[in-house]
């Protein structure tokens, strides 16, 4: 399972970094609509967090990214035996590391996927593949914890009860 997680994480990270490289050198000054005004490809450099929040505070965002990656490692260790949780967390890690890489080496995050839903300012944003990994991984992890974690916990308790009953009978 560990090898699978490493492979998944590396492949996803490579896809993210290649897509950012291609966007940076091929899309400057362009806006390519894909689905009307709702979805398109455009290149932007975001020196903040989501929606440009904390723009210009690269050092703070790097520190926050380091803390998030450490927390992610702790969560991964804690849930390492929960079925599929390590895969979901590998997806999150690929997203976190992709954006962390950008902040370290460029001072900003390279975004290229424009999403617009109506005229609402909170739904008009540009993101990247790493951001999508973050959302997918977090949602998958939440589903796994909600639906599989209790089963694993119960089976672990059953195994412990069985071993304790064997100790009593021996």
What are these regions (language model features)?
Residues 1-170:
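Alpha-helical transmembrane bundles and membrane-interface segments of multipass inner-membrane proteins
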């Amino acid at each position: 399972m560990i090898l699978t997680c490493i492979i998944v994480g590396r492949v996803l990270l490579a896809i993210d970094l290649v897509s950012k490289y291609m966007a940076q050198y091929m899309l400057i000054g362009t806006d390519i609509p894909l689905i009307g005004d709702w979805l398109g490809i455009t290149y932007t450099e975001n020196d903040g967090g989501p929606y440009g929040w904390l723009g210009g505070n690269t050092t703070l965002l790097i520190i926050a990214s380091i803390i998030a990656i450490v927390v992610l490692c702790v969560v991964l260790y804690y849930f390492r035996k929960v079925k599929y949780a390590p895969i979901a967390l590998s997806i999150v890690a690929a997203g976190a590391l992709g954006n962390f890489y950008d902040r370290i080496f460029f001072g900003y995050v390279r975004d290229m996927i424009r999403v617009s839903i109506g005229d609402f300012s909170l739904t008009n944003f540009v993101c990247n593949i790493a951001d999508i990994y973050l959302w997918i991984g977090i949602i998958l992890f939440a589903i796994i914890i909600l639906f599989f974690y209790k089963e694993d916990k119960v089976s672990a308790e059953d195994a412990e009860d069985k071993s304790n009953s064997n100790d009593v009978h021996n």
